[in-house]
Structures are given as C-alpha cells and as structure tokens.
Curated annotation (Swiss-Prot):
It catalyses: GTP + H2O = GDP + phosphate + H(+). GO terms for cellular component: cytosol; ribonucleoprotein complex. This is Elongation factor-like GTPase 1. Keywords: Acetylation, Disease variant, Elongation factor, GTP-binding, Hydrolase, Nucleotide-binding, Protein biosynthesis, Ribosome biogenesis. GTPase activity is stimulated in the presence of 60S ribosome subunits. Changing M882K: In SDS2; uncertain significance. InterPro entries: EFG_II, EFG_III/V, EFG_V-like, EFL1, P-loop_NTPase, Ribosomal_Su5_D2-typ_SF, Ribsml_uS5_D2-typ_fold_subgr, Small_GTP-bd. Expressed at low levels in brain. Expression is highly increased in glioma tissues. Residues 17-272 form the tr-type G domain.
Length: 1120
C-alpha cells in the first residue's frame, strides 16, 4: 500500500516476463472505473475510502458530471506476490457505445483484458461487442462478475438462488465465446478448402473429414470461463471485496483436511460435502444437497451482510474475531452499513489481491505473444504473410523475441493521439527551489524593501545598487524606475500564460520490440505505407536513412523527443522504455494524425487498421459566431480530428465545415472540446444533418389503405406515371418499360439507359465488400496507366472471385441473365452499392476483365469516351433527383451507345481541316520552313483522328457525354417508383417491467419498431431490441430516461439502411384514401416530410404553399 517511486517503476519495466498489459472492458455502468479505483488504491495512489467515489481515471470534467468514461487512459501499478514483482499496465476503457473506438485503441496495445459483467444485468449488448473486439485482436480475457452485493441487497436472493443466477451468467458468456470460436474454426476450414482447390495434389475426401473434425479436434477448453480454471473472480467493487475459489480452497484445505487441488475442482459445480465421511460427493441437485460453493462461500458472505444490515453487533464482533481482523472504532460506530461492510470485507477478501493475482497467473506477458497474432497485426485482409519481402518476414522473430538488445529493431505502435494541457507536462511543472535560489530571492526582496523605504523618506541609501548606479533621492525619480522594473517583471507572464494554454499531443503507444530511447531517429509509417514501395525506390544495402532518400508515400522520419510513463492524470518523464511497455510519446503531432507504426527499419509494414464497432453517422455543420474567427475554428477542428480516433471532419461542396460523430453523447463531447480546448471560440451548431439514400422499387401491389390495387387505381397510377413523364423535357424518348433514350446537345451521340432496383441481398453484398471493390478499382487504374504498383495477391484474387460468385448467386432470372459479367462500374465514388451495366453491342467492357478489344480503332474510340460515361454515372449516383442524396441499390443498364454521327462529323471536319491546310501550305511561294511546319500540323491532326474530342458551341464532347449520361440516369430513375431510404439504429433497451409500456410508447412515437423482447432470468429486467430511424433518435435517450424515471437506458448503434414504405410523391386516388388521408395527404406522408426537410436545408425548391385561403385566417366581423 506504499506509493512506489519512479525509480521502482523503471526497474520493473526492464523485466519483460513480469509485465502485464491489460485493459478493463464492459458494458456501460458495470463497474469498470470503480474496479480500476480499487486496484489503484492498492498502490497507495488514492485512499481506499475514496475508491469508487473518486473515479480517478476519469480526469475530464464531463466524465465526472455524466458518470461515464469517455476515453481510454492508462496507469502503471506494482503488484508483489511471494518473491515475484509484477508491473501491471492497466487501461480503463469506456463502456458507452458512442466511445467504442476508444476500446479499439486500448485493446490493440494489450495482451489480455478483464471482462466485467454486472451480476444482476448479466451479458449485455456492449459486453458482446467488447468480447468480440478482444477476440478479433487475439488477446486473452479473464472474467470479473461484479456487483454481487446487488444480489443480496436489491434482489434479496438466497445463496442457492444467487448460485443458479451466477451459473446462468457464466453459461451465457461461454456460449458467446463458443460462437466466436466456432466461426473462427469454420473460417480456417474454408481457407484450407480454398488452398486445397488451388493445390491439385490434395487428397480426395479430405473436405468431408475436415467437416467432421474441424470443431472436435480443436482444443477449446482454455477459452472458456470457469472458476476452477482460476479465470473467474466474483467481486463487489463498491464494497471493496472480491475472491476467486483458490482463496477459499487454500483456507478449507487446512480446516477440512482435503487437498487444495481437489477443492479447486469441486468448489464450483454439482458437488457437495459429506461431513461425516469428509468426502466430496457429486450430484447435489439429485440429492437435495447444497453445493460446495453455496455452503462454504456464499453463505458466509450472506451471513456477514445480514449481520451488518440488521446491525447485530454481537454477530459482527464474532465474525470479525473469527476472521482475525482489526476494525477501527470509527468504522465500527458508523451508521452507514456500507462503511462497515467495506471495512470488514476489504481486509477479509481484498479485491485488488484477487484480481491482480488472477491477472498475473492467467494473462500472458509480452513475451508470450503468439505467431498468429503477429501475422494478423502485420497482414491486412488482402495480404498474406508469405507475400511480404524477406526483410519484412524477418521482423516476425523480433516480435516474438521482444528483445531489448541494441541490435533489435525498435517497433512501436501508436494507437491514438490524445491532448493534454501543456502545463501538465513534467518539464513544465513548477519544481521546488534550491537553497541558493531561495537565498537569492530573499536578498532581492530585502533590497526592494530598502529601496521603497528610502523612496518614501526621500533619502538615498549610502551604498550603490548591484549594477553600480546610485539610487536617486527624489521620489519622483524613483517612480519611473519602479514602473520600468514592474513592466519588466510583468512582461513575460502573458507570454507564459499563452504558451501554457496550448494543447500538447501525446501518442498513446506500446513498444513491441527494441528499446525506445529519447532522441532516437525512427521511421513513421502511415496506415497506407507499403514496404514494397520503399524497397522499389531505395537501392539495396542502405545503412542509415540519409537526407537524399527519395520521397516514399506515407512515410516520415523523425526523432523521439519525449517519453512519458502514463500514470492516469499524471505523466512522468522517462529517458528510455524497454520492450513490452505502454508509454506516451511527445513531439509526434506533426507526423501522426490518428494512429501509426514507428520502426527503426523501413521494411516493417504498418499494423492493420483498428476495428471500430460504431460507425460515425451523426453530422452537424459548425461555424464561428464571429466570421473573423474562422481561422481559429479551422485550426481547432484539425486538433479535434487528431485528438479523437472516431470523429470525422469534412468540408462540403457548399463550404460548410461538418463534424461526423458516433452519437449524441460523442457529438456533445466533441463540441465541448472544440469550444473550450481547441478553438476556444463561440460557435454556432446546425441541426443534425440526417443522412438519407434514394432508391427505386417495384410497382406496389397494394394501396396506402392495404387494399389490392384495382382497375380504378391502376388507371390513376398510369395517369400519375404519364404526369411524371410529362415533366421530362421534350426530345427525350421514354418507352413503356422505362427505357430513356437521350442525345447529346450537339446530336452526335445517343444513349439508351434503363434503371432497375437491385435485390436487397445484392445491395448488402456490395456494402460489405466496398473495400474489395476499391482495391479492384485501384488495380484497374494502375494497370491502365501502365504501372504495376498494385500487385494482386492470391488472397485478393480469391476474394474477388468469391465476391463475383455471390453476385451471380443472387442475380438470377431472365432480367439478370449474364449481367454480372457485364458490370462496368460501381458507384458512387467507384465503390458504392450501385451498378452500371454495359449491354452495348459496339463496345464491351467489364470491371472483371477490362476492355474486350484494345486493338481496333473503333474500340479505342469507345474506350477513350467510356470514361465520360462512367463519370456521368458516378455523378448521377452521388446525388439523386429527389433531394440530391446518394443513390443505393440501383442498377443502371446502358442498352445502347451510338457514336456513328460523331464519327461521320469527325471525319468530315478532319477532311475540311486537311483541305484548308493543303491550300494554306501550297497557296504561295513561301519558304521551305513554312511548308514543313504546315505538313507537321497536318500530320499531327491526322494522327489524332478519332481520339481528340470535338469541341463546338456546346463545349468539349467528353463533357457533353458526362452531362447526358447523368441526365439519362436521373430521368430513368424518375420514371420508376422512387423511395427514400432512412439510416436505422439498432436500439437495445434494458428496462424493468413496470416501465415497459412507457418504453413502447416512446418507441412508437418516434417511428421505432420492436424486434424482440426477452426477460432476464431471475430478475425483473427486460431487454428490448428495436430499430429506430436516425432522424427520430435525437433526444430519444433523454426522453426515455425522463418517461421511465431513469429505469431504462438505451444503447444506439448504426445498423443498416431501410426503405421508407410510403411514396414521397403519392397523392390519394380512391374514396377510401381521400377519407383516410384527406385531400392533400401531406400530414401522414413521412417520406415527403423527410424529403422536403432535406430540400429546404439544401436550398432546393420545395413544392408547398405557405398560405392558402388567407381570408379564412382573418376575423372579418366583430362579435358584439
């Protein structure tokens, strides 16, 4: 319990085998920060009485106000057991879903994690999410079941009921672990199948054998949580106690005389003790006996709580005496039972010992990093470890060794950048004065006092001052000198204050190999850096990076300026950090944006990107209240973008500065940081910018009152379609199937385009494979430019063919025949969920194979102008006709592309120009040089036949094609049934039974839809799973807490896009619809409301009347 010195921590850092890098993960309000407080108090950093109340790791003011953790923060703890001393680098992480990106940054630099579960609420949605993140990062978890006291105090469980409840929680979390394990085994099996297909020498029948043994032959016993394995601890962090069954096994082995190993296996499970025979028997439930866990452990804890809550002083004294504890008189006389329980239990079952002992025994050290995790960190999804150059593959051994030799390469990963006040840095903190400085200050103060007395009496001192000048006797002469001295002493202070107000950025990092020393030169590798690119540009055999190295993309070179030991709110200065430790690095703000890999060798690949569970979806536009402060806002947004791993900063085409965040709480934190820390100005924030998507659907079969569309309605629908088509300008042909035929303004090219809705499964496949589509586009563009920078890997090729196979599987039927092979492009931004299909007979081009024929001049001409067609498609999918939002789930089919008139016009124009050139060159007796120049110009024009786009009064022909293709796509959309797509949240709500009706009322009011409702066994808690439009989510959490008096708390995570069923352009046609919806039907049409709101925000035309029948709004006659 003694506060450790910095020297002690530096000494512990050098023993890599005894380092444990761990993070605490849990659902919100399950007790992570309280548990961290208890562990911190064991080192004497805070008082044990303040544990759970101080929330030491929550250093932000808004964290203390809201009572939730918003950022990951680290602290180093010392733990001694027996002859071993351990250094625990503990990282506390948030549990709120808005800050799940902070969990990702913490998990990446850890080797193990503590999963905290509330004993009452059990496994919650965010528990599943953090366990999945730990699994993806290949780190080992241990389990802490917290808040056991709630089972006693709140739910009034008996020990037997509590045991059954705890068993259910363990079963739930082990079932989740089993699901993750099964998916991993099946993925590995699928990879082996793919390799066996590539390798023809594989034995037949192996696939069937793998199917039956993939799960059976894999040992998964070490993955599951079980108290007998020692990876589960039962705690009450607020009361300061916790235990593993090893503690009681050691005690009862001495009392009962049964071996400790036997008790370790039987204290948890269906075992009971036969006291007469002193034997442990199996089958407690069948024989109606109490399990050992209930009889020997839970009943003792229950009896203690019962005695304290009932204030049975005699029983309390008896328990304290039997346990050999010493309780202070203050705690014994205290009226609050919690104080007495804490005083007794923290001595009897100290939580810090139970948790830290489990961490040291069950979680790995940095030396135990697995080869699988190393390869996963180094390889992105499109690369395999074998595809790296030999220099890169050799680094795997350095990862595994985690050596501190001078020859070992230094490898550091920066998971995030965080901002601290410059005054909080160790070098800027005030230090204690030395004796000499104190004496000098005393002498100067005495001298100033003597001068003031002399000035007041009008007498000069006999001795001169230190600088040799005599002090004037006149008080008036003294005043200017005194003022001058005052100005000199006060001048530096504003400058210092201004410097101290600046934010300094610290890199949150971990050393994986080598020793990080202050001043060491190192490469900074961005997420997109490629070691192959470096080795291609830099000659072999270079030793140190000289200044003459060529520019390599996404790589910089800098020195490690300052190294810090992270101690929660404090930072300690370090000269060097051995491998395996977590540290802070100063001076990287100009080189690292959010995350980066630091390495002394440029052959190191960047670590794979972090896995973010939450997608940024909430957008607001910000601007300064005073326009002159725009530079401060821009600078502040840059700093905010660097300080937050999840936030996105965008500048739209309109010039708006847009902030994209993960949710309302995250948005509020970002705005507070912008106003108070980074920009320090007053800002105006717009209403949330709701994202929508536009799409088309099949014609409906039922009307708005759920009746089958009859003849009268079909006539009305046809009439409505004709009205829609009448809005299309003249000269554009529309057939009955929605085929749009349009010509360019100069009438030289004709395009025929049709729009079709994609099946929902295909849209989902396109969304899931957007990164793969982007890689395909980069590969295609590099090949077209004659470069070979993007070498395709075998794994990527397999993914591409798998992606194509999925599309072929879902695009079946007469309409979609052979359409996958004819896909020309994806959009928007060439990787979106829309497809351009080329069915033109004159020119065949596919995204899978490229242009079919590059040799013929005609195909070359089509290929050159094809980029204009694709650009028009990209523009059309980027902004739809309804409210200029991106399209989703639409297939545009280019049925015809006629360039015959363009070729004729080009040939005739070229002939005329050639004739004029001939006449000019042969028309007179010019000298030979002029004739040579004319012939060269003619040859140049001739060589560009069919390749140079014609330019006329309508502009370049390529630009006309872009605009025409864009208009064709928009008109093809408008002749189909259009729909809006809304972004949807998955909403998980935990509520008690008595407020369930209010929860449903709030959900229905906000257009929510309940998907599932289940009751937590043994409690009165319900878990409601619903979907809620993002547009209706603002203020939802506050409203539901108000309506339920804080008994329900929602967790909102972006899930998917969903089509709004109502047609935004629908008008009533039948009598039933007129009666139900009224003449205008604008009050019930949710899609129209959303569409008009977006159009108003963007300044587009909105078809609505502001005032109608104004005389009805006036009182024309006075009532007497």
């Amino acid at each position: 319990m003694v506060l450790n010195s910095l020297d002690k921590m530096i000494q512990l850092q050098k023993n890599t085998a005894n380092i444990r890098n761990i993070c605490v993960l849990a659902h919100v309000d399950h007790g992570k920060t309280t548990l961290a407080d208890c562990l911190i108090s064991s080192n004497g950093i805070i008082s044990s009485r303040l544990a759970g109340k101080l929330r030491y790791m929550d250093s932000r003011e808004d964290e203390q106000i809201r009572g939730i953790t918003m950022k990951s923060s680290a602290i180093s703890l010392h733990y001694a057991t027996g002859n071993e001393e351990y250094l625990i680098n503990l990282i506390d992480s948030p549990g709120h879903v808005d800050f799940s990106s902070e969990v990702s940054t913490a998990v990446r630099i850890c080797d193990g994690c503590i999963i905290v579960v509330d004993a009452v609420e059990g496994v919650c949605p965010q528990t599943q999410a953090v366990l999945r993140q730990a699994w993806l990062e290949n780190i080992r978890p241990v389990l802490v079941i917290n808040k056991i006291d709630r089972l006693i105090v709140e739910l009034k469980f008996t020990p037997q009921e509590a045991y059954s409840h705890l068993k259910n929680i363990l079963e739930q979390i082990n079932a989740l672990t089993g699901t993750l394990f099964t998916s991993k085994v099946l993925e590995e099996r699928a990879e082996r199948e793919t390799e066996s297909q590539v390798n023809p020498n594989s034995e037949q029948g192996e696939q069937v054998y793998d199917w039956s043994t993939g799960l059976e032959d894999t040992d998964d016993s070490h993955l599951y949580f079980s108290p007998e394995q020692g990876n589960v601890v039962f705690t009450s962090a607020i009361d300061g106690w916790g235990f593993g069954i090893e503690h009681f096994a050691r005690i009862y082995s001495q009392k009962i005389g049964i071996k400790k190993e036997v008790l370790m296996k039987t204290l948890w499970g269906d075992y009971y003790i036969n006291m007469k025979a002193k034997k442990i028997m199996k089958g407690d439930q069948a024989k109606g006996k109490k399990p050992l866990f209930v009889q020997l452990i839970l009943e003792n804890i229950w009896s203690l709580y019962d005695a304290v809550l009932k204030k049975d002083k005699d029983k309390i004294d008896k328990i304290v005496t039997s346990l050999g504890l010493k309780i202070g008189a203050r705690e014994a006389r205290h009226s609050d039972p919690k104080v007495q329980i804490n005083a007794i239990c923290s001595q009897w079952l100290p939580i810090s010992h139970a948790v830290l002992a489990m961490v040291c025994q069950k979680l790995p050290s940095p030396l135990d990093i697995t080869a699988e995790r190393v390869e996963r960190l180094m390889c992105t999804g499109s690369q395999t470890f074998d595809s790296f150059p030999p220099e890169t593959q050799a680094l795997k051994a350095a990862f595994m060794k985690c050596g501190s030799e001078d020859t070992a390469p230094v490898i550091i990963f920066v998971s995030k950048m965080f901002a601290v006040d410059a005054k909080a840095l160790p070098q800027n903190k005030p230090r204690p004065l030395t004796q000499e400085e104190i004496a000098q200050r005393r002498e100067r103060a005495r001298q100033r006092h003597a001068e003031k007395l002399a000035a007041a009496q009008g007498q000069a001192p006999l001795e001169p001052t230190q600088d040799g000048s005599a002090i004037e006797t006149c008080p008036k002469g003294e005043e200017p000198r005194g003022d001058e001295q005052q100005v000199e002493s006060m001048t530096p202070k504003p400058v210092l204050q201004e410097e101290n107000n600046q934010e300094s950025f610290i890199a949150f990092a971990r050393v994986f190999s080598g020793v990080a020393r202050r001043g060491k030169k190192i490469f900074v590798l961005g997420p997109k850096y490629s070691p192959l690119e470096f080795l291609r540009r830099v000659p072999l055999g270079f030793s140190a990076p000289p200044d003459g190295l060529p520019q390599v993309p996404h790589m910089a070179y800098c020195a490690l300026e300052n190294l810090y030991l992270l101690m929660g709110r404090e930072l300690e200065y370090l000269e060097e950090v051995p491998p395996g430790n977590v540290l802070g690095i100063g001076g990287l703000q100009d080189f690292v944006l959010k995350s980066a890999t630091l390495c002394s060798l440029p052959s190191c690949p960047p670590f794979i990107p972090l896995n973010f569970e939450a997608t940024p979806i909430v957008r607001v536009a910000v601007e300064p209240k005073h326009p002159s402060e725009m530079p401060q806002l821009v600078k502040g947004m840059k700093l905010l973008n660097q300080a937050d791993p999840c936030v996105q900063i965008l500048i739209q085409e309109t010039g708006e500065h847009v902030l994209v965040t993960a949710g309302e709480v995250h948005l509020q934190r970002c705005l507070d940081d912008l106003k108070e820390r980074f920009a320090k100005i007053h800002i105006s924030v717009s209403e949330p910018i709701i994202p929508f998507r536009e799409t088309i659907t099949k014609p409906p079969k039922v009307d708005m009152v759920n009746e089958e569309i009859g003849k009268q309605q079909k006539v009305a629908v046809i009439h409505q379609m004709k009205e829609d088509q009448s809005k299309i300008p003249e000269g554009i042909q529309v057939d009955s199937d929605g085929l749009i035929t349009i010509t360019t303004p100069n009438k030289l090219a004709t395009l025929s385009v049709r729009a079709m809705p994609l099946p929902e499964e295909v849209t989902q496949i396109l969304e899931e494979n957007s990164d793969l589509i982007r890689s395909m586009e980069q590969l295609t563009s590099s090949l077209n430019e004659g470069e070979n920078t993007h070498m395709i890997h075998q794994k990527t090729q397999e993914k591409i063919w798998e992606f194509k196979g999925k599309l072929e599987q879902h695009l079946t039927g007469r309409r979609w025949r052979n359409i996958v092979d004819q896909i020309w492009s994806f959009g928007p931004r060439k990787c979106g969920p829309n497809i351009l299909v080329n069915k033109s007979e004159d020119f065949q081009n596919s995204v899978w194979t490229g242009p079919a024929d590059k040799a013929s001049k005609e195909a070359s001409r089509y290929r050159d102008l094809g980029n204009s067609i694709v650009s028009g498609f990209q523009l059309a999918t980027l902004s739809g006709p309804m409210c200029e939002e991106p399209l989703m789930g639409v297939c545009f089919v280019l049925e015809k592309w006629d360039l015959s008139k363009f070729e004729e016009q080009g040939a005739s124009d070229l002939a005329k120009e050639g004739q004029e050139e001939n006449e000019t060159c042969s028309g007179g007796n010019e000298n030979q040089e002029l004739q040579d120049g004319c012939s060269e110009a003619f040859e140049k024009r001739t060589s560009q036949k069919g390749e140079s786009p014609l330019t006329d009064c309508y502009g370049p022909f390529s630009g006309q094609l872009i605009a025409t293709m864009k208009e064709a796509c928009r008109y093809a959309l408008q002749v189909k049934p259009q729909r809006l797509m809304a972004a949807m949240y998955t909403c998980d709500i935990m509520a008690t039974g008595d407020v369930l009706g209010r929860v449903y009322a709030v959900l229905s009011k906000r257009e929510g839809r309940v998907l599932q409702e289940e009751m937590k066994e043994g409690t009165d808690m319900f878990i409601i799973k619903a979907v809620l439009p993002v547009a209706e989510s603002f203020g939802f959490a506050d409203e539901i807490r108000k309506r339920t008096s804080g008994l329900a708390s929602p967790q909102l995570v972006f899930s998917h896009w969903e089509i709004i069923p109502s047609d935004p352009f629908w008008v009533p046609t039948t009598e039933e619809e007129y009666l139900h919806f009224g003449e205008k039907a604008d009050s019930e049409n949710q899609a129209r409301k959303y569409m008009n709101a977006v159009r108003k925000r963007k300044g587009l035309y909105v078809e609505e009347k502001i005032v109608e029948h104004a005389e009805k709004q006036r009182t024309l006659s006075k009532n007497k």
